[in-house]
C-alpha cells in the first residue's frame, strides 16, 4: 500500500529543549492505488506541509518498500512546493528489527537516502528509543529557523480608525 492515513492529526507539544511549544501535524501516510475520489482530499492534506517550519519525514525502517516510499515523498514534496522546507528524516520501528540486524538495516536505510543531507534519526515510537534525540533535532531546527526569521510586527493602529475610515 502506498498511503495509509488520510486524516491529519494536529497537537501542540512543549519542547523543553527549545523553551517553547510547537504545533505538530501528522499528515498523510502511504497507500497504493488511491481511489480517484480521494485524490483531492489527499492533495489538500499534503498542502498543509507547505506552511511547516520543519518537516519530519517518517519512514518505516522495517519496510522493504522504504526506499520507494521515501522517493515518492520527496517527489510529492517537490510537486507541492515544499522541497525547501527543512526536514528531519526519521526512521521509525526499530523495535521491529532484531538487535543483531539493526546495524545492517540502518546502514541500508542510510544508503536508500544517499542524497539526503538532513539529519537522520532512528527511533522506536513504541518503546521510546531515540525520541530524546528526535526532540533535540526538532528543537534545534526550530531555533535556527526562528532565529533567522523576521517576525511580523503589529501596527499600533487599530483595524478601524474612526477619523480616517478603515485602516
Task: Please tell me what each predicted stretch does.
Residues 24, 58, 90-93:
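Generic enzyme active-site microenvironment
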Residues 4, 18, 64-167:
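C-terminal-of-GTPase-core extension/linker across diverse P-loop GTPases
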Residues 15-21, 51, 83:
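Short flexible coil/turn linkers enriched for glycine and charged/polar residues
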Residues 1-9, 16-44, 61-64:
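Switch II (G3) loop of P-loop NTPases
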Residues 37-63, 75-82, 124:
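Inter-motif core of Ras-like GTPase G domains
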Residues 25, 51-55, 114-118:
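Short acidic (Asp/Glu) and glycine-rich catalytic loops that position anionic groups and cofactors
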Amino acid at each position: 500500500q502506498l498511503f495509509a492515513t488520510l486524516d491529519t492529526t494536529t497537537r501542540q507539544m512543549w519542547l523543553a529543549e527549545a523553551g517553547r511549544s510547537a504545533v505538530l501535524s501528522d499528515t498523510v501516510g502511504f497507500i497504493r492505488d488511491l481511489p480517484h475520489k480521494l485524490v483531492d482530499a489527499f492533495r489538500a492534506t499534503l498542502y498543509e506541509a507547505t506552511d511547516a517550519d520543519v518537516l519530519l519525514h517518517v519512514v518505516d525502517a522495517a519496510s522493504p518498500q522504504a526506499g520507494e516510499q521515501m522517493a515518492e515523498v520527496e517527489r510529492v514534496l517537490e510537486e507541492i512546493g515544499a522541497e525547501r522546507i527543512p526536514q528531519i528524516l526519521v526512521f521509525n520501528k526499530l523495535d521491529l528489527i532484531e538487535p543483531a540486524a539493526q546495524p545492517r538495516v540502518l546502514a541500508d536505510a542510510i544508503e536508500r537516502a544517499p542524497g539526503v543531507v538532513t539529519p537522520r534519526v532512528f527511533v522506536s515510537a513504541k518503546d521510546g528509543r531515540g525520541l530524546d534525540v528526535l526532540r533535540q533535532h526538532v528543537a534545534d531546527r526550530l531555533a535556527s529557523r526562528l532565529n533567522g526569521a523576521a517576525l511580523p510586527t503589529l501596527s499600533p493602529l487599530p483595524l478601524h480608525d474612526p477619523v480616517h475610515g478603515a485602516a
